Protein backbone atom coordinates (compact mmCIF):
# COMPACT_ATOMS: atom_id res chain seq x y z
CA UNK A 1 0.00 0.00 0.00
CA UNK A 2 1.44 3.37 -1.02
CA UNK A 3 1.61 6.26 1.41
CA UNK A 4 -0.71 9.11 0.43
CA UNK A 5 0.72 12.47 1.47
CA UNK A 6 -1.22 14.48 -1.12
CA UNK A 7 -2.89 16.51 1.64
CA UNK A 8 0.49 17.81 2.75
CA UNK A 9 1.95 18.97 -0.58
CA UNK A 10 5.51 17.72 -0.32
CA UNK A 11 7.49 20.33 -2.23
CA UNK A 12 10.75 20.11 -4.14
CA UNK A 13 11.89 23.26 -5.92
CA UNK A 14 14.53 24.03 -8.52
CA UNK A 15 16.71 25.31 -5.67
CA UNK A 16 16.90 21.74 -4.28
CA UNK A 17 14.65 22.51 -1.32
CA UNK A 18 12.46 19.80 0.13
CA UNK A 19 9.72 20.05 2.72
CA UNK A 20 6.00 20.43 3.37
CA UNK A 21 4.31 23.55 2.03
CA UNK A 22 1.29 23.21 4.36
CA UNK A 23 0.04 21.16 7.26
CA UNK A 24 2.34 22.52 9.99
CA UNK A 25 1.37 23.50 13.50
CA UNK A 26 2.49 25.10 16.73
CA UNK A 27 2.05 24.29 20.41
CA UNK A 28 3.32 25.69 23.71
CA UNK A 29 4.24 23.51 26.68
CA UNK A 30 2.57 24.43 29.98
CA UNK A 31 3.30 23.71 33.67
CA UNK A 32 6.93 22.45 33.45
CA UNK A 33 9.59 20.98 31.13
CA UNK A 34 8.28 17.41 31.38
CA UNK A 35 4.66 18.23 30.53
CA UNK A 36 3.64 16.55 27.28
CA UNK A 37 2.15 18.38 24.31
CA UNK A 38 -0.18 17.38 21.48
CA UNK A 39 0.36 18.50 17.91
CA UNK A 40 -1.03 16.43 15.03
CA UNK A 41 1.08 17.69 12.13
CA UNK A 42 3.98 16.50 9.99
CA UNK A 43 5.99 19.59 10.88
CA UNK A 44 5.79 22.42 13.32
CA UNK A 45 7.06 24.37 16.27
CA UNK A 46 7.08 23.50 19.98
CA UNK A 47 7.78 26.21 22.56
CA UNK A 48 8.98 24.85 25.91
CA UNK A 49 8.16 26.10 29.38
CA UNK A 50 10.71 28.41 31.01
CA UNK A 51 11.09 26.27 34.14
CA UNK A 52 14.73 26.17 35.28
CA UNK A 53 16.85 23.22 34.08
CA UNK A 54 20.00 22.82 36.21
CA UNK A 55 23.52 22.38 34.83
CA UNK A 56 24.13 18.81 33.58
CA UNK A 57 20.41 18.00 33.86
CA UNK A 58 17.94 16.90 31.22
CA UNK A 59 14.17 16.73 30.89
CA UNK A 60 12.13 14.62 28.48
CA UNK A 61 8.55 15.17 27.35
CA UNK A 62 6.16 13.27 25.10
CA UNK A 63 4.79 14.81 21.91
CA UNK A 64 1.50 13.12 21.04
CA UNK A 65 1.15 13.25 17.26
CA UNK A 66 -1.25 11.10 15.24
CA UNK A 67 0.87 11.62 12.11
CA UNK A 68 3.80 9.60 13.52
CA UNK A 69 4.17 5.90 12.73
CA UNK A 70 6.64 3.64 14.49
CA UNK A 71 9.00 3.46 11.49
CA UNK A 72 9.11 7.22 10.86
CA UNK A 73 12.08 9.47 11.50
CA UNK A 74 11.48 12.62 13.53
CA UNK A 75 14.06 15.39 13.24
CA UNK A 76 14.27 18.32 15.68
CA UNK A 77 16.34 21.48 15.82
CA UNK A 78 16.55 24.43 18.18
CA UNK A 79 15.16 27.55 16.57
CA UNK A 80 15.86 29.94 19.44
CA UNK A 81 15.45 30.60 23.12
CA UNK A 82 18.23 28.72 24.87
CA UNK A 83 19.75 30.97 27.51
CA UNK A 84 23.23 29.49 27.97
CA UNK A 85 24.19 28.27 24.46
CA UNK A 86 25.06 24.85 25.94
CA UNK A 87 21.61 23.32 25.52
CA UNK A 88 20.73 20.53 23.10
CA UNK A 89 17.48 18.91 21.99
CA UNK A 90 17.04 15.47 20.49
CA UNK A 91 14.41 12.82 19.81
CA UNK A 92 14.89 10.08 22.39
CA UNK A 93 11.99 7.75 21.44
CA UNK A 94 9.70 7.32 18.43
CA UNK A 95 6.49 5.30 18.74
CA UNK A 96 3.19 4.93 16.91
CA UNK A 97 1.35 8.19 17.60
CA UNK A 98 4.08 9.92 19.57
CA UNK A 99 7.72 10.80 20.03
CA UNK A 100 9.76 12.03 22.98
CA UNK A 101 12.06 15.04 22.99
CA UNK A 102 14.88 15.42 25.51
CA UNK A 103 16.18 18.88 26.41
CA UNK A 104 19.67 18.70 27.93
CA UNK A 105 21.61 21.45 29.68
CA UNK A 106 25.18 20.46 28.82
CA UNK A 107 26.98 23.16 30.78
CA UNK A 108 29.14 21.99 33.68
CA UNK A 109 29.28 25.35 35.45
CA UNK A 110 27.50 25.22 38.80
CA UNK A 111 24.49 27.49 38.88
CA UNK A 112 24.27 27.79 35.08
CA UNK A 113 20.62 26.87 34.73
CA UNK A 114 18.79 26.87 31.40
CA UNK A 115 15.81 29.19 31.86
CA UNK A 116 14.83 30.12 28.32
CA UNK A 117 11.63 29.22 26.51
CA UNK A 118 13.22 27.08 23.80
CA UNK A 119 11.54 27.00 20.40
CA UNK A 120 11.99 23.60 18.76
CA UNK A 121 11.29 22.96 15.08
CA UNK A 122 10.32 19.41 14.13
CA UNK A 123 9.56 17.44 11.00
CA UNK A 124 8.28 13.89 10.55
CA UNK A 125 9.93 12.03 7.70
CA UNK A 126 7.65 9.21 6.62
CA UNK A 127 9.63 5.98 6.36
CA UNK A 128 9.20 2.29 5.71
CA UNK A 129 11.11 -0.35 7.63
CA UNK A 130 11.96 -3.58 5.87
Give the role of each language-model region.
Residues 1-68, 79-80, 94-130:
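Extracellular receptor-binding modules and their adjoining Ser/Thr/Gly/Asp/Asn-rich linkers
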Residues 86-94:
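Glycan-recognition/cleft segments
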Residues 74-77:
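Short, surface-exposed alpha-helix to beta-strand junction/turn motifs within ectodomains of secreted
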Amino acid sequence: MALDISNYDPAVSAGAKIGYSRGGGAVTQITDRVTGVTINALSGRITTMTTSLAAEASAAFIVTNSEVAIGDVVVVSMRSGNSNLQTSVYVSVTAAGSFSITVANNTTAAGAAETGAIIINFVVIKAVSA
